[in-house]
């Protein structure tokens, strides 16, 4: 049997691949440490000042994403929220995300140049729930936390938090007031 490809059949095959579930989306992975991650998360040497500088140089915001093994909301974040191409592409395109374990033992160099375990850093930042996103920006010449998202909001509000931070709206208004203003006619 001879296979004869026409431009039309090739175009249809390409379209089918692009429309297939998951096409063009980043992969959700379960790491050896039992934590869900995205293949677009920053491959970090865990020096937060360097990671922040690299994010700024790339024109992106910077966030830490905290999780823990066995966390059902962390799984949901990765299998439902980041499976949504609108959410996933916005976060991937606008933020550099470093993933940390709330109980982890890897050594992290913080913004103040002190090295400590992930667990100790989570304690310093009072991160108690997972998933938690911490967003960082510059104020007074220093890197500081500018917003925090503990747990999961409904998808529209979750995405809105990233847009709020990306817009720098945290300098002028709280998240809820900003959300209300976005919905106003």
Model-derived regions: residue spans:
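N-terminal secretory signal peptides and thylakoid transit peptides that target proteins
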Residues: 1-17
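N-proximal helix/coil linker or "cap" segments that precede and/or mark the start of modular domains
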Residues: 27-41
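A short beta-strand-turn-helix
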Residues: 44-60
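Short active-site neighborhood of thiol/selenol oxidoreductases, capturing the structured segment around
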Residues: 58-71
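Typically the conserved alpha-helix immediately C-terminal to a functionally engaged Cys/Sec
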Residues: 75-90
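Thiol-based oxidoreductase modules, predominantly thioredoxin-like and allied folds used
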Residues: 88-116
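Structural micro-motif
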Residues: 118-134
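Non-catalytic, surface beta->alpha helical segment in thiol-disulfide oxidoreductase systems
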Residues: 129, 137-170
